[in-house]
From Swiss-Prot:
GO terms for cellular component: cytoplasm; cytosol; myofibril; nucleolus; nucleus; plasma membrane; protein-containing complex; T-tubule
Single GO molecular function: signaling receptor binding
Subunit structure and binding partners: Homodimer; via EF-hand domain 4. Interacts with TTN/titin. Interacts with CMYA5; this interaction, which results in CMYA5 proteolysis, may protect CAPN3 from autolysis. Interacts with SIMC1. Interacts with UTP25; the interaction is required for CAPN3 translocation to the nucleolus.
Subcellular location: Cytoplasm; Nucleus, Nucleolus
Ranges for region Linker: 587-649
Residue span of region Domain III: 418-586
Binding site for Ca(2+) 2: 705, 707, 709, 711, 716
Tissue distribution of the protein: Skeletal muscle.
Protein's name according to its UniProt entry: Calpain-3
Pfam families listed in its UniProt record: Calpain_III, Calpain_u2, CAPN13-like_C_EFh, EF-hand_8, Peptidase_C2
Function: Calcium-regulated non-lysosomal thiol-protease. Proteolytically cleaves CTBP1 at 'His-399'. Mediates, with UTP25, the proteasome-independent degradation of p53/TP53.
Residues covered by the Calpain catalytic domain: 74-417
Catalytic reaction equation(s): Broad endopeptidase activity
Length: 821
């Protein structure tokens, strides 16, 4: 049994009308149906608190490889094991696959034979033609290819059953390590295979990509652009061919010259992802078809040599075909790679040609310029050689550009960025990357059709600082491209996640608000039209679009079409000239009284047990004036001269109630605080609250107690009550329906009105902590939140002696501060 060694997935180095109308119904792209889904991961600051205290650094591929060689074992990946868990998550497969390493499948296995090329990719029994079309495009650019497929991997020299591949994931390059066990049936690969039966780079690349997304099933159905971007870090543009610009062929030629990746498809009218099954076909039916396909395939051929050692083409399974094959040989609902563009002389005229490839490795176009076209005899021999014309069933074919435009409906071009490929021929673009999150009840506001919540979406300020360098353009214009990408939806499919329908809008910030990073409020969006926006909201992983706007300051608002949909995203802005893109509301502060107050140090409970080390003599004397009781002053508190006369009726009533409950020591515990607060609050019938809970009162004491006694005196309680009264007014202002609750989306404004200025992450955390399942916050939770904010800011400022916004705590101080809260 091979020894198991831990793997790694480690990072590598035009304006609308004045009154905006509703957003049109979202477009249905070639993607899965938009819907709810598992929420994205919470912020790293929260996740990291559950990490082991002593972290173990993940081993790199080199370390794992070296360890396997030293121990003379073959690597076995425990994170993506060779069993059913790595295959399908929705249903158990009815037949048993045998996981084999390439040396067990054939003699003389090779990683790459004669260079990786597009004919090395033949689709197996998985609906991932979108992925394979992208891989075929990748082979056209060797520098890109070997960024994804690192050099020096083989089945001979230093072979240890371990391989690795690199993918771009939301702004970072990650190294994915796998073992080389592959699923087989009758000694044949079930999924992607090469045209040569002893070549395995494409099968292993598919496995690494499946691991990245959790399983092979997760690769079923998708858009070519997803894989293109994961291979390059580029940004994709979509073209509806029927609405294509007149110079589309020129655009495609330029894309080929620049090393961009291109894919195309024909709509089948079902609004499904490429390679998925027709409506109503579930995973069980898909598996049943796969079984029938295998049983009827050439795999049952008794003459098949299970350990063929030559490099002859492998005998492949015809893929499970859900796509609709047309009479012309093209397939609807299927992804093709665009592998070349040329102009050929035919009967004295130049004809524009497009070369395409079907990832099945078979089933080709049978019209003009196809492999078997009868009029090839009229094409010059040198021209044939230049076009590499040969009659072979390899899935690749030429067709005229006119036929291409007539039959195909969508074109996808993945443009490379500086992150993926450096070239002197390409213009340098400035790239800004922002990560964000839509949180239900706080920042998942939906599109402009939902004005009450649209303004709560994350907002990103964009400063276009310099105009384009275009001597032929008299306009003062900045060119830029915005790309919004949702994260982890494919990986979370097994948890019920689907792609959301997403889009964005761009608004110009008024000059008087330039430099102000505050979150723009609802009224701004009610009375200002957007300057630009995505063409449509669509359920795809990424939506992108080019814009040309004058230099100014703008705000980009990314959103889902429907509100309350929770997920993570990244927002990328590419511009020809310098720009600055950052999230609005990124400063944290609290409004402080103008009058300076004496800086009292924070007193920990343990400090009082240790001779009050943090208290000076002056502080103790001052405390003695405030705190009363036999153990502090030895006598009952005496009112100051004229104090009673100055007290209002409410204050007198307040003091009397407090005295009745607190007793002679004039201090109250959590139970007594609960009685005091609820006695007073119950008189305010308009609040419609059930009062404060005991746990809430314990938190109030912990956060308002200035000396660590675990109790509140009259002065401390009076300070608390003044705050509660002020916060009560804010609560009533936002409780517009007098239900005793406020909508969690309004909490941002309420917190701001109370003088606390937070960033988006903190507003998200407040919503998760205090809102109920209906996204409402009751009076008790509302006050608890504000008490906690007040106490936390007060504690921080007490430690921040030099006012630089940074404090240093030892572990005892940290535990005391957080435990007693």
């Amino acid at each position: 049994m091979p020894t198991v060694i831990s793997p790694t997935v480690a990072p590598r180095t035009g304006a609308e009308p004045r009154s905006p109308g509703p957003v049109p119904h979202p477009a249905q792209g070639k993607t899965t149906e938009a819907g709810g889904g598992h929420p994205g991961g919470i912020y790293s600051a929260i996740i990291s608190r559950n990490f082991p205290i002593i972290g173990v650094k993940e081993k790199t591929f080199e370390q794992l490889h070296k360890k396997c060689l030293e121990k003379k074992v073959l690597y076995l990946d425990p994170e993506f094991p060779p069993d059913e868990t790595s295959l399908f998550y929705s249903q158990k497969f009815p037949i048993q696959f045998v996981w084999k390493r390439p040396p067990e499948i054939c003699e003389n296995p090779r990683f790459i034979i004669g260079g990786a090329n597009r004919t090395d990719i033949c689709q197996g029994d998985l609906g991932d033609c979108w992925l394979l079309a992208a891989i075929a495009c990748l082979t056209l650019n060797e520098r890109l290819l070997f960024r994804v497929i690192p050099h020096d991997q083989s089945f001979t020299e230093n072979y240890a059953g371990i391989f690795h591949f690199q993918f771009w994931r939301y702004g970072d390059w990650v190294d994915v390590v796998i073992d080389d066990c592959l699923p087989t049936y009758n000694n044949q690969l079930v999924f992607t295979k090469s045209n040569h039966r002893n070549e395995f780079w494409s099968a292993l690349l598919e496995k690494a990509y499946a691991k990245l997304h959790g399983s092979y099933e997760a690769l079923k159905g998708g858009n070519t652009t997803e894989a293109m971007e994961d291979f390059t870090g580029g940004v994709t543009e979509f073209f509806e061919i029927k609405d294509a610009p007149s110079d589309m062929y020129k655009i495609m030629r330029k894309a080929i010259e620049r090393g961009s990746l291109m894919g195309c498809s024909i709509d089948d009218g079902t609004n499904m992802t490429y390679g998925t099954s027709p409506s109503g076909l579930n995973m069980g039916e898909l598996i049943a078809r796969m079984v029938r396909n295998m049983d009827n395939s050439l795999l049952r051929d008794s003459d098949l040599d299970p350990r063929a050692s030559d490099d002859r083409p492998s005998r492949t399974i015809v893929p499970v075909q859900y796509e609709t094959r047309m009479a012309c040989g093209l397939v609807k609902g299927h992804a093709y790679s665009v592998t070349g563009l040329e102009e050929a002389l035919f009967k004295g005229e130049k004809v524009k040609l497009v070369r395409l490839r079907n990832p099945w490795g078979q089933v080709e176009w049978n019209g003009s310029w196809s492999d078997g076209w009868k009029d090839w005899s009229f094409v010059d021999k040198d021209e044939k050689a230049r076009l590499q014309h040969q009659v072979t069933e390899d899935g690749e074919f030429w067709m005229s550009y006119d036929d291409f435009v007539y039959h195909f409906t969508k074109l996808e071009i993945c443009n490379l960025t500086a992150d993926a490929l450096e070239s002197d021929k390409l213009q340098t673009w400035t790239v800004s990357v922002n990560e964000g999150r839509w949180v239900r009840g706080c920042s998942a506001g939906g599109c402009r059709n939902f004005p009450d919540t649209f303004w709560t979406n994350p907002q990103y300020r964009l400063k276009l600082l310099e105009e384009d360098d275009d001597p032929d353009d008299s306009e003062v214009i900045c060119s830029f491209l915005v790309a919004l990408m949702q994260k982890n939806r494919r990986k979370d499919r097994k948890l019920g996640a689907n792609l959301f329908t997403i889009g964005f809008a761009i608004y110009e910030v008024p000059k008087e608000m330039h430099g102000n990073k505050q979150h723009l409020q609802k009224d701004f969006f009610l009375y200002n039209a957007s300057k630009a926006r995505s063409k449509t909201y669509i359920n795809m992983r990424e939506v992108s679009q080019r814009f040309r706007l004058p230099p100014s300051e703008y705000v980009i608002v990314p959103s889902t079409y429907e509100p309350h949909q929770e997920g993570e995203f990244i927002l990328r802005v590419f511009s020809e000239k310098r720009n600055l893109s950052e999230e609005a509301e990124n400063t944290i502060s609290v409004d402080r009284p103008v009058k300076k107050k004496k800086n009292k140090p924070i007193i920990f409970v343990s400090d009082r047990a240790n001779s009050n080390k943090e208290l000076g003599v002056d502080q103790e004397a001052e405390e003695g004036k405030d705190k009363t009781g036999p153990d502090k002053q030895g006598e009952s508190p005496q009112p100051r001269p004229g104090h009673t006369d100055q007290e209002s009726e409410e204050q007198q009533q307040f003091r009397n109630i407090f005295r009745q409950i607190a007793g002679d020591d004039m201090e109250i515990c959590a139970d007594e605080l609960k009685n005091v607060l609820n006695t007073v609050v119950n008189k305010h019938k308009d609040l419609k609250t059930q009062g404060f809970t005991l746990e809430s009162c314990r938190s109030m004491i912990a956060l308002m107690d200035t000396d660590g006694s675990g109790r509140l005196n009259l002065q401390e309680f009076h300070h608390l009550w003044k705050k509660i009264k002020a916060w009560q007014k804010i609560f009533k202002h936002y409780d517009t329906d007098h239900s005793g609750t406020i909508n969690s989306y309004e909490m941002r404004n309420a917190v701001n009105d109370a003088g606390f200025h937070l960033n988006s992450q903190l507003y998200d955390i407040i919503t998760m902590r205090y809102a109920d399942k209906h996204m409402n916050i009751d009076f008790d939770s509302f006050i608890c939140c504000f008490v906690r904010l007040e106490g936390m800011f007060r504690a921080f400022h007490a430690f921040d002696k030099d006012g630089d916004g940074i404090i240093k705590l030892n572990v005892l101080e940290w535990l005391q501060l957080t435990m007693y809260a």
